Amino acid sequence: GLGDVYKRQAIGAQMALGRDQRVVMFTGDGSFHMNLNEACTAVSYELPIITVIFNNQVLGMVRQWQTAFYGKRFSQTDPHRKTNFVKLAEGFGLKGYHCENLAQFQEAFADALKQKGPTWIECMIDKDEKVLPMIPGGGDINDIIMK
């Protein structure tokens, strides 16, 4: 739901912490596409950021809002792209992982911790998986949606 801010925050945190500690960043595939250029910075500086990409192959937060507030009238939420994040990582010279279940994620994460530079872990999720809690537009903490 934060679109274009995730990567630079992870880069800043990793620069502040140094290479002895690991930053783990969680993002969606849509957000990752919006900031692919920032991956170049992490690669150039060999920052050991572990990026976990929740891939539902749609713009999940937009779809979630359209489900909750617009009667599932979906508009512009399916970009019709099926990115292979493992091959994309390899194109950057990185280690990439593709996970379909928790056991695969646990194995990938354990291996990612051993890598020296950035790594990407793609986790496939259902296109209707929700990100909660959320506060509706114009609302406050009293309007929080928990389920």
What does each model-found stretch correspond to?
Residues 3-147:
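Thiamine diphosphate
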